[in-house]
Design a protein with these regions (language model features):
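Non-catalytic, conformational "gating/processing" segments within enzyme and secreted inhibitor domains
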Residues: 49, 88-277, 296-389, 393
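Generic short beta-strand
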Residues: 403-405
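A short acidic/small-residue loop/turn micro-motif
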Residues: 420-424
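Positively charged n-region of N-terminal signal peptides that target proteins for export
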Residues: 1-5
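Mature N-terminal segment immediately following signal peptide/propeptide cleavage
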Residues: 32-46, 51-57
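N-terminal, post-signal-peptide region of Sec/Tat-exported proteins
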Residues: 49-86
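Bacterial N-terminal signal peptides
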Residues: 7-16
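Boundary at the C-terminal end of the N-terminal hydrophobic targeting segment
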Residues: 16-17, 21-25
């Protein structure tokens, strides 16, 4: 009998301005894996030309915990598809260091806003960041102690017992409530009804909640309706924020990159704007993890920025099919009998774990004060029976479809990655 494994990742983010000078040193194993999978999922897991936002960090955190229990060909396939390094010890260490860096950032006290950041210069609210991981496992199931010890030590993910056999629906409600609490009510009903059954054995969850104000707010009085050109060329009027100041900037082959920093300077919004109104598809073909890493340290220049306000709340993503199409088939027991998570729990031909689905849900809103975003991902496991620097001030009008990311500057990690085709 195969037992389902569910991995949930949730992330919420609230942000609000920053800059491209030099590329990062070689990105860490975790940062590279996060960004590379994000690029893959944006291209393969979402419909071209539509609004979308993913949390590559959230997705990878849950899958990295799952990977800690994989063995044999299942592990080999996951290594390739998830862009992991062969040195697994170093990989988990890298994810642990990234989690610590994010948690440390979220634990900093209230900062005094720079002049002009808040009217009157009063203290601004600090960046609020919570990163939480948890395992929800079947009560009494024989999970291997080394696996449990690794994910708790490295990912801060304790095991919470749930009796899926007696009442899978009650377990689903409990997990969704935990997700909702961690994401400040931005992510609700992550795991849909009937997704968990009496065969469910483990749900792996990552949650990130981030609320960060801009380093300098956009003046509310400057916001006005301006035309935004949709992918078919039609203009629509949308509320557009405007601000002039030092921001990161680079003019590259066919597009511009602008970074707008958040308070504290450890996070920024990256905007990748095609030069032409119909250039989004060509830009997405150029998108690579190396490009994202290079954009993490931009050159400061004087920018006149016009940026639309927007709010995105796509439905739950089911990522299993996309991960299969990328080559990660054995983890989903395809072909039957191939799933091998023996390092997570003892495997026999008639009783073993497999991934049944990976659920992911996001939320993001951007306005004059900052950005709020949330995401959640769940991996369910089931039991089975068999750059160029400008020299003059630059006007950047974000008035047609573009790509965006919320980046952790020092590592280049994309906490969120998406596209905006229609801000309405």
């Amino acid at each position: 009998m195969k037992l389902p494994l569910t991995s949930l990742l949730m992330a919420t983010l609230s942000l609000g301005a920053m800059p491209i000078s030099r590329a990062l040193e070689k990105p860490s194993a975790a940062a590279h894996a996060v960004n590379a999978l994000g690029v893959d999922l944006l291209a393969r897991g979402t419909a071209a030309g539509t609004n979308t936002v993913l949390s590559p960090y959230s997705i990878q955190s849950a899958l990295a915990m799952t990977y800690a229990g994989a063995a044999g060909d299942t592990r080999s396939q996951m290594t390739g598809v998830l862009h992991y390094s062969e040195d697994e010890t170093a990989l988990h260490q890298s994810f642990g260091e990234l989690r610590t860096a994010l948690e440390t950032m979220g634990a900093k006290p209230v900062e005094q806003a720079p002049a002009g950041a808040k009217k009157g210069g009063e203290p601004a609210q600090p960046v609020q960041l919570t990163v939480a991981n948890r395992l929800f496992g079947q009560q009494g199931y024989e999970f291997r102690p080394p696996f449990l010890e690794l994910v708790e030590r490295t990912y801060g993910a304790p095991l919470q017992s749930i009796d899926f056999i007696a009442n899978a629906e009650a377990g689903r409600v409990k997990i969704n409530n935990w997700v909702e609490e961690q994401t400040k009510q931005r992510i609700t009903d992550l795991i849909p009804g009937n997704a968990l059954t009496s065969d469910s054995r483990l749900v792996l969850v990552n949650a990130i909640h981030l609320k960060a104000p801009w380093a300098r707010e956009f003046p509310t009085r400057a916001t006005q309706p301006l035309p935004f050109h949709l992918k078919n060329g039609d203009p629509v009027e949308v509320d557009t924020m405007q601000r002039t100041g030092k921001m990161g900037y680079a003019k590259l082959d066919g597009f511009q990159a602008v970074t707008v920093p958040y308070l504290g300077g450890e996070l920024h919004l990256l905007v990748l704007l095609p030069e032409t109104r119909d250039g989004l598809a060509a830009l997405e073909k150029k998108l690579t993890p190396e490009l994202l890493a290079a954009c993490a340290s931009p050159t400061l220049t004087e920018i006149e920025l016009s940026l639309p306000k927007f709010k995105l709340e796509p439905p739950v993503f089911k990522l299993a099919e996309t991960l299969r199409s990328l080559g990660m088939t054995h983890a989903f027991d395809d072909p039957k009998g191939s799933a091998n998570f023996d390092r997570m729990a003892p495997r026999t031909p008639k009783d073993y774990l497999m991934i049944s689905e990976v659920f992911h849900k996001t939320y993001m809103a951007l306005d004059e004060k900052g950005t709020e975003a949330a995401a959640a991902t769940a991996v369910t496991m089931t039991r089975s029976t068999s750059l160029i620097e400008p020299t003059t001030p630059v006007a950047v009008r974000v008035d047609h479809p573009f790509l965006f990311a919320i980046q952790h500057r020092s590592s280049g990690t994309c906490l969120f990655l998406g596209r905006l085709c229609d801000p309405r």
